[in-house]
């Protein structure tokens, strides 16, 4: 697949990004902080190199395990409140999970394939590919979107 360098259609304005983040801080972070009695993470940072490496990895592993990887689903999570997680213990995180469609081989000559098997299964989490985590917990230096 050729790399696209055009402007992505999903871009938003800095003003709207600021509004989204302020809404999160007002309607989610403040409630969470009262419950866990400490300030939670409000951003997670991954380097471009880490993300590109993960994308390359999931495409290659998907192909090896019979999946056409077509996306990444981002899940929210919370680290266990255990010492081994140090400063991340009890804090929010995100992890990335490859999604895709199982590659279906065409039936051999003379074989009949049922309608159910021919149907598209849609974007599903690819359980044969490990999720990615361990970005840097960030508290953005300022809301300068």
PLM-predicted stretches and their roles:
Residues 1-49, 53, 60-70, 78-145:
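Detector for the mature cores of small, proteolytically processed
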């Amino acid at each position: 697949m050729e790399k696209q360098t055009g402007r992505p259609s999903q871009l938003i304005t800095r003003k709207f990004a600021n509004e989204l983040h302020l809404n999160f801080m007002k309607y989610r972070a403040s409630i969470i902080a009262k419950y866990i009695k400490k300030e939670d993470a409000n951003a997670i940072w991954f380097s471009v190199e880490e993300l590109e490496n993960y994308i390359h990895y999931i495409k290659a592993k998907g192909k090896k395990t019979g999946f056409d990887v077509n996306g990444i689903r981002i899940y929210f999570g919370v680290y266990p409140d255990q010492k081994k997680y140090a400063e991340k213990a009890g804090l929010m995180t995100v992890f990335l999970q490859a999604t895709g469609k199982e590659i279906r081989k065409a039936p051999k000559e003379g074989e009949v394939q049922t309608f159910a098997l021919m149907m598209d299964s849609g974007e599903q989490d690819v359980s044969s590919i490990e999720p990615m985590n361990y970005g840097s917990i960030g508290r953005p230096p300022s809301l300068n979107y």
